[in-house]
Amino acid sequence: MDLHIAGRKAIVCASSQGLGKACALSLSREGAKVFINGRHEDKLRATAEEISRETGHAVVPVVADIMTDEGRAKLVAACPDADILVNNNAGPTPGKFEDWDHAAYIAVFEQNFLPAALLIRALLPGMRQRQFGRIVNITSAMVKSPRAHQGLSTAARTALTALCKAISTEAVVDNVTINNLLPERIDSPRQQYLIERQAKMDNIPVEAARQKLTDTIAAKRFGRPEEFADMCTYLCSEQASFICGQNIQLDGGSYRGIV
C-alpha cells in the first residue's frame, strides 16, 4: 500500500532512541524527509546516519531541548513547513502521590504537556493553510488506565489528550488530523528502565521481573517498537484522513475496557 508519505516533511521529537527513533525510521522508509530531535549531538547524528543508511532518504538531526522556548524555536525553524509532527518526550519517574509537590507538577507539565502543545501551536496554522497535516502524540496507556504510581504522567498526558481533542474538531476540516498513540509494554529503553527499577524494588533478578511483567500482557509478549512505529506512520498517511481525535492503544490486548 502506498501511504503517500514520500516527499512529506516530518518532525519526530525525542527520536535518538526508543519509540521516537522507531517512528522516524518507519516514516523514512516511506520516503518522508525526517527531522529528528534530541539533546545529545553525537548520539543524534549517529541515529540520523543510521536511519539514512538503511532507508536511502535524507534525515536531518536537530539538536534542541524541546522543553525550552529556544529549543522549540530551533526545531520549528529547521522545518517550518512540516507536514507531520510526532510529539514525544520521556516520562517522569514513577512515585507516590504524597511525595509530589508543586515543583513536581510544574516539571511534568513542562515535560509532557507544554512541548507538544506549543509545537502544535507553531505548526498547525501552516498545516491548515496547506490543507494537509498529521499530528501524532505519543502519550501513555495510563491515559485510559490510570495507576497511582504513574499519577504525574497521567495528569500531564491526559491534559494534552483533552486539549488535542478540542482543537482536532476544528483542524480536521482542513485535512489536519490529531491522534494519540497509547503505548504499554513496548520493548523500549523506557520499558527496560521500568523493569530494572521494579527488579530492584522487589529484590529479584531483572529477567524474573521481565517475565513477571510479560505474564500480565494478554499477548504474553512485549510489543516490538516497529509495530508501534508502523501504526504511527499509518496515522500520518493519506488513508488515515478520517481518523481524528482518537486514542489508540498498543498494548497486546491488555486493556480491560471496551471504550
Question: What is the meaning of each model-derived region?
Answer:
Residues 88-94, 253:
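Conserved NAD(P)H cofactor-binding loop of Rossmann-fold oxidoreductase domains
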Residues 136-159, 164-173, 184-186:
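Catalytic loop of short-chain dehydrogenase/reductase
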Residues 172, 177, 243-245:
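Short, small/polar-rich loop/turn modules that mediate ligand/substrate recognition or access, typified
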Residues 9, 14-18:
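Conserved glycine-rich cofactor-binding loop
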Residues 96-98, 104-109, 213:
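Substrate-binding pocket helix/loop in short-chain dehydrogenase/reductase
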Residues 145, 233, 244-259:
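Short C-terminal tail/terminal secondary-structure segment
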Residues 125, 169-170, 241:
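Alpha-helical segment proximal to the catalytic Tyr-Lys
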